[in-house]
Amino acid sequence: MSKRDYYEVLGVERGVDEKALKSAYRKLAMKYHPDQNAGDTAAEDKFKEVGEAYAILSDPQKRAAYDRYGHGAFENGGMGGGSPFGGQGGNPEDIFQDLFSQVFGAGGFAGGRRRSGPQRGADLRYDLEITLEEAFYGKDETIHVPQAVACRPCEGTGAAPGTKPETCETCGGHGRVRAQQGFFTMERTCHICQGRGQIIRKPCKTCGGHGQVKEERKLQVKIPAGVESGMRIRLSGEGEPGTSGGPKGDLYIFVEVVEHDIFERDGPNLYCRAPVPMTTAALGGEIDIPTIDGGRARVAIPEGAQTGRKLRLRSKGMPSVRANGQTGDLYVEMFVETPQNLTARQKDLLRQFCDCSGADCHPESEGFLGKIKRFWGGEGDEKRPV
């Protein structure tokens, strides 16, 4: 079967530069890497194909020969005896590892060679809900976190007490094995030890051979005053234990402040809506506004106050967790409450007020009526819509 054009394999033009060539190869190699497509022979063939194409086109001498003679440059012993890797001992996996180690460091890709030595433990997440009042004052919270700890009976080895894990004979303790396929050498996770490099003949009954068990730990967490939803608190070294003597991971506590019945929050500022009796709004007066600290603030209402008017109470908001010593404000939006369930006398008094009130008492209404008249083209009924 004839081979595809190497440029076509990598999806690049013939004049592609080295940077774009490397980028195209990296994308395809990640897509078709055997460790990402276990058991998929088609993906494995693709991985070999892109590796072969990159081996030629990334070498200036071989690329020049390919551009001039095509695949014939590497047949009948030319340019390395028929192997596109030119007798240098290279293979698609080695090219892939060399390229990705430049980007991620040794072992940085999931399909890379097994990392040896101490490994840091995994980080943990804990979601914590608190009230707005708790966020205002801050608090010391006790949390219970389930996490993996080293199994005490086997001391974290996973082997039954009195026994030890044995080095895997198949991979020699490396966790990965190599298989020769023509001129390719493929590296895979060892199927005997599952990449651990060790075999446990007699597993520990307590942990089932895992070397770790789940326990619930009680921790004290200090929640700072002014904390907001979405903020996280880091407890260093309170995550999962490391392996082979590696350090513990960290515990991240994600805070969620639940909605409040009265106040809405925007950073350090608080907002609320306060009902104002119609008479107070008309004559002026005072109303009491609840504050987040559990107290009350007396607010002066000016004569003729209207719905939607906002009042600002300085330093009655939330403490700022980002700026020590600073406190936000409380913004109060008024809405005039229309009286309901009136008695006959109350209705009569309102009618008397209506009879003696003029345009000066309702400037907004008069202004609105004037706009309507101008919209209709005057006061005449002949131009009004039916």
From Swiss-Prot:
Co-factor requirement: Zn(2+)
Main location per the UniProt record: cytoplasm
Disulfide bonds: none
GO molecular function: ATP binding; heat shock protein binding; unfolded protein binding; zinc ion binding
Keywords tagged on the record: Chaperone, Cytoplasm, DNA replication, Metal-binding, Repeat, Stress response, Zinc, Zinc-finger
Textual note on the cofactor: Binds 2 Zn(2+) ions per monomer.
Biological process per Gene Ontology, one example term: protein refolding
Entries under PROSITE patterns matching the protein: DNAJ_1, DNAJ_2, ZF_CR
HAMAP family the UniProt entry points to: DnaJ
Subunit structure: Homodimer.
Domain notes: The J domain is necessary and sufficient to stimulate DnaK ATPase activity. Zinc center 1 plays an important role in the autonomous, DnaK-independent chaperone activity of DnaJ. Zinc center 2 is essential for interaction with DnaK and for DnaJ activity.
Protein name: Chaperone protein DnaJ
Organism, scientific name: Hyphomonas neptunium (strain ATCC 15444)
